[in-house]
Amino acid sequence: MPTFKLVLSDPLSGKARQFEIKDPLAQRFVGLRIGEEIDGTVLKELIELPKGVKIRITGGSGVEGAPMHPGVPGPVKRYILADGPPGYRPRKRGMRKKKLVRGDTITDSIVQINAVLVYPEGYSGPPAIPLGAKELEKLKGGKTEEAAASQ
C-alpha cells in the first residue's frame, strides 16, 4: 500500500502544490520512470486541471532521503560518484563525492514524487495552480495604493 507526496509544479504561475496520494490512485504511479508523462485526469479527485494537460515525472526521493537519479536505471539503490546535481552540489569546481541515489523508477519505497504540468500547445487559459492573494496584490501594486490612501 504505497502512499506518496506529490509535489506538482505549474510553469505558468511558478507555483507548486503538495498532495497526499493514497491507494488505489498511488498504484497508477508505481512503475513510472523519470521523464514519463501521464494524463492529468488521473488527479481529478485532488485538483481540477484543464483539458489536455499532462503530468511529467521529474524526480523524487526515497524513504531514506536519497534522491531519484535519471542516470540509474530501474528500481534500485546505488552509490554513484556524483559531480553535480541531482543529489550533490559541489563546493568547488571539479569536486566529486560518493552519494547514495535511487533509480529512475517509482516503487513502494519512494516517499515523494516531483512532477510538472505540461500544457498543450497554444494553451492560453489561466494556470491550474493559481497565484495566491499576496502575489496578486504584488502584481497589481496594492501596497502602493494603500500607502497613498493612508497619507
Curated annotation (Swiss-Prot):
GO biological-process terms attached to the record:
translation
**Gene Ontology MF terms in the entry:** structural constituent of ribosome
* Keyword Disulfide bond on entry: no
Q: Which GO terms describe its cellular component?
A: ribonucleoprotein complex; ribosome
* Alphabetized InterPro entries for the sequence: Ribosomal_eS6 (IPR001377), Ribosomal_eS6_arc (IPR020924), Ribosomal_eS6_CS (IPR018282)
According to the lineage, what is the superkingdom?
Answer: Archaea
Keywords, A to Z, come to: Ribonucleoprotein, Ribosomal protein
Its family? Belongs to the eukaryotic ribosomal protein eS6 family.
What NCBIfam families does its record include? PRK04290.1-2 (NF003293)
- Write the protein's name: Small ribosomal subunit protein eS6
Organism for this UniProt entry: Pyrobaculum calidifontis (strain DSM 21063 / JCM 11548 / VA1)
Q: Which gene encodes it?
A: rps6e
